[in-house]
């Protein structure tokens, strides 16, 4: 990846552990509230959804947009963050 935001770099620097979902790159405050309301309060829970979708970025992005109210930018950044985390830790 050519350019990593500081937030993405920080997220990729260590295992997910008990990080709140708001730590995931691309997750705005408003989107975090929507996700928590739907039961996705931790980054590992959101990662689980990504893995259930077999790491298919387009499918995951569509789900974030349609079901959670993400913008296209947020969905793209979030799926990229989780994909990069999987590359580093799985």
Swiss-Prot record:
GO terms for molecular function: DNA binding. It comes from the Eukaryota. Belongs to the BAF family. Its main location: nucleus. It is found in: Nucleus; Cytoplasm. SUPFAM superfamilies: Barrier-to-autointegration factor, BAF. One of its GO terms (biological process) is chromosome organization. Keywords: Cytoplasm, Nucleus. Disulfide bonds: none annotated. May play a role in BANF1 regulation and influence tissue-specific roles of BANF1. Pfam families: SAM_BAF. It comes from Bos taurus. The gene is BANF2. Homodimer. Heterodimerizes with BANF1. InterPro entries: BAF (IPR051387), BAF_prot (IPR004122), BAF_sf (IPR036617). This is Barrier-to-autointegration factor-like protein. GO terms for cellular component: condensed chromosome; cytoplasm; nucleus.
């Amino acid at each position: 990846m050519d350019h990593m935001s500081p937030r993405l770099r920080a997220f990729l620097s260590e295992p997910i552990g008990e990080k709140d979902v708001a730590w995931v790159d691309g997750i705005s405050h408003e989107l975090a509230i929507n996700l928590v309301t739907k039961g996705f309060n931790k980054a590992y829970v959101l990662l689980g959804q990504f893995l259930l979708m077999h790491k298919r970025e387009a499918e995951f992005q569509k789900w974030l947009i349609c079901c959670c109210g993400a913008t296209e930018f947020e969905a793209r950044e979030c799926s990229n963050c989780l994909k990069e985390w999987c590359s580093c830790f799985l």
